[in-house]
Amino acid sequence: AKRTCVDPSKGRQQAKLYADLLEQKYGRRPVIFLTNGFDTRMDDGAYPERKVAAFYSKRDLEKLFNLRSMRISLKYVQVDKQIAGRYYQEGAIKAVCQAFGEKNRRKALLVMATGSGKTRTVIALVKVLLEHGWIKNVLFLADRNSLVTQAKRSFVNLLPDLSVTNLCEEKDNYSARCVFSTYQTMMNCIDTVEDEDGKLFTVGHFDLIICDEAHRSIYNKYRDIFTYFD
């Protein structure tokens, strides 16, 4: 932590020395946060240092370390063909897994035509990432209630063991592993939904965010969602 008039990167070397010593002592490298009160940056050791909206909560950090210990390589994944059996669906899923695993990326874009099975592709991808220990909590965003309802129904049918909730309809069910919402509803929930520890939808709450449509107008209007969640 530095004063507001100081660039938080000034403390980077000092923080890394602390992290090195803690790793030597406890056998696990801690997450580094750099801040001056306005800008906050995070170095989790898995990805390049990046800007975040706030500190991770204790629960976020525990989940991060638990997932890291359970994570399996995505190099040789088996796609559930009962969910996504078309060759291009399997190819899309493997391409995303390669981007996340081998190329160490944090974002992926799938461009698929109407009727090509986008939702099934995403469901099969979620199953792969869950089975390989890469994710725990999922957020599915769409710009209309009907699309949210339709997507949730598909997830329930194809992944019946995954707990799900639709924030547009279920106002008191926030503990599900897979959350479905419109952009506007999620904007409201970020600030208003709390549990006994405070804000529920913290910066690191979701491990995977799926956008039903990724066009520029959506991003420009709801940019805050994507800059808030890490």
Q: What kind of feature is each model-predicted range?
A:
Residues 164-172:
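Short acidic low-complexity segments
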Residues 197-230:
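SF2 helicase catalytic motif II
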Residues 187-190, 218:
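Activation segment
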Residues 1-137, 142, 146-162, 174-178, ...:
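ATP-dependent helicase/translocase motor core
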Residues 171, 178-179, 217:
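Extracellular/periplasmic ectodomains of large secreted or surface enzymes and adhesion receptors
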